[in-house]
């Protein structure tokens, strides 16, 4: 009798242990994971779509639920927030120089971060275009038209916005080529352009709002994706996209933030999240949101959406961001010298 009771007790204990293990395993499978993607201004719609698809894929693959929170603003401003303590698991910023600043000032990821993913950790590209009102009433076709008297130009502040820095360099590069490499003439051209800028918003999306919704300005210097999105949201009967004679290859990079990921226990999923951007599914979402995909098959599918034009590059034409950032946008740099509000 005693033996049977002992066996029964062991059996019950085994059942309870198995149940607890099963429950524990189930709890692991149903983990609630949260990531923070600190991004630049005009990527809201892109990452809303990316996050939803990645979460579905991750759930199917692992059983875990993942929520990706988004933070958006001017790229330089966002980099400063991370440096000052905003706990980003990943950063998806407007230019490599802003992630380099996080390396240099906060030491949150290694200096060779750009080598960890394909295409220098830039899963998509973009360029800079001109958005005008329907019918192009001011006859704006190229950079020269932006310096004409009476033209009101909307562009954000290159001190805080990554897009604004691409805008500035595209205009500078145009003027430099037109004037045979004469930097004094390029500076005079860009100075004249900024004299036509009534207000510098802190980020690209703010400038788009100023132009599109507040109806300020004759022309918006814009990310291609934001210009295309404006046509989609507000109608081709409201605006037109103008491709200038030359622009710049904008390469927005991505990186996981190692020291934050270690603290959060999110290293593996942060890496997987950014790798998803390179998959055919991720590239499809990228193209659908008017960014230029790297995948050749996806790029061919959307070729009509992305006109070809001559493009300057940050490395070949400006010596890379480590040279361009202090020269043009550092304290006392070219922008500080040519931009005189109210003058």
List each language-model region with its residue ranges.
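N-terminal secretory signal peptides that target proteins for export/translocation
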Residues: 1-7
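N-terminal segment of the mature folded domain
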Residues: 30-161, 303, 339-340
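Bacterial N-terminal signal peptides
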Residues: 9-24
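A bilobed periplasmic-binding-protein/Venus flytrap-type ligand-binding module shared by bacterial periplasmic
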Residues: 127-136, 251-268, 285-289
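Extracellular/periplasmic juxtamembrane helices and adjacent flexible linkers that interface
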Residues: 261-343
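Short helix-loop capping/hinge motifs at secondary-structure junctions, enriched
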Residues: 135-141, 160, 173-181, 260-268
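Short beta-strand->loop
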Residues: 38-40, 132-134, 152-179, 194-197, ...
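Ligand-binding pocket segment of bilobal, Venus flytrap-like solute-binding proteins
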Residues: 178-245
